[in-house]
Amino acid sequence: ESEQGVNDFNPTQLMWDVHPDRDREWFEKETRNMSRRQIAQELECNFNTSGETVIHPDDIKRIFQNVREPRHRAGFDRNYWIWEEYNSDYTYMLVADVARGDGKDFSVFHIIKLETMEVIAEYQGKPAPDVYGNMLFSAGKEYGNCLLVVENNSVGFAVLDKLKDLEYPNLYYSIKSTHEYVNQLEAEVMTNSVAGFTTSQKTRPLIVAKLEEFIRNKLITIYSSRTSNEFKTFVWNNGRPQAMRSY
């Protein structure tokens, strides 16, 4: 309202470098763990609006420079894309998102090579929960019984039950109250543990912030055109990060 002359306040913008004790070294240290959005709002007087991508356009452009065709397209629907096969010299983790079950979104998993933080395999499709559970079991076995981190939403529990029935040996468990990771062998004899990862109002902003931080700091490499394209439609909507409607 002050910018529009509606009230008697005089708008003033004070950039971070106005302060005499703040130099480029201070700025670099202060912003190391801040998202571009936080930097713009808190230090550059540039307040983001709805519709802006969560990932900065410059970072999205850089991500696309790494996009390449997978070496293999596997699975019953050919939607399991593989860029690199299992290598026993490395450690892997499989992270799985489970579709809601209404047919409007996809079940997706990514396999990450932890030493280099490369996403070396990916699936995106709409299999039934039991089929998806079998796929996760096979993919996890293929990559050395890697840790399976499966989202435990309503349908996710059905997928996790399938993996338990198949006796997969390396499922992600956490403490219900704190979301703290706990080893599977310990978790199976605890009463306050839960299989899978819980995406909640508490954990979702942390997940998004960490994703943005890893991309901005060039800590993760993504080869998939599908994932890269999703960053173009992952936007801020009234302060909440979410996919654009119809995407």
Model-derived regions, located:
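Signature of the SF2 helicase/ATPase Hel1-core->accessory helical subdomain module
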Residues: 1-18
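RNase H-like, metal-dependent nuclease domains and their acidic two-metal-ion catalytic environment used
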Residues: 7-8, 24-185, 201, 205-209, ...
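N-terminal cationic and glycine-rich segments that engage phosphates or anionic surfaces
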Residues: 21
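Intrinsically disordered, low-complexity, charge-dense segments enriched in Lys/Arg
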Residues: 184-187, 194
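Structured lumen-facing ectodomains of secretory-pathway proteins
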Residues: 194-195, 214
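A charged helix-plus-loop insertion that forms the helical arch/lid used to bind
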Residues: 196, 200
